[in-house]
Amino acid sequence: QELIEALRKIAPFVIIDCGSYIANDILSAVSLLECDSALRLANCDLKSISYLSSQLQLLQNSKWDTDKQYKVASNVKPNHSVDHMAGAMGSVSFQLPYSEELEEQYLSGNLLADMTLKNSRPFRKEIEKIAKEVFGC
């Protein structure tokens, strides 16, 4: 908690990439308790849906303010059903579409490169919507 408070004093926004097994990760648990807002990303595949379903009882605990949680269906491909994700997560606030360009950047270890391809435009637009909603910019 002290770390998060110190970070808030030196930066206007603090982004913490939490682990997915919150019960055994003290930084993630404290971050979720102290955050102004949280993005919960989950892929639209059976493995992610199953894991998320197993964690929902913990994530919906009264300690975690569910009103400040934005639920994001991530890596959505045309053949995926976001309805299944909405069933597992509750309402989905955002849908991050699959981007081949992003996958190539990930595989090459170059995630900080600009995304310039036309077929990445839907992904970039959704990221802009998330930034506007969560950070107000």
Task: State the predicted function of each range.
Residues 13, 37, 91-94:
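Well-ordered beta-strand positions
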Residues 15-17, 39-44, 69-75:
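Conserved beta-strand segments of the P-loop GTPase G domain that flank and frequently precede/overlap
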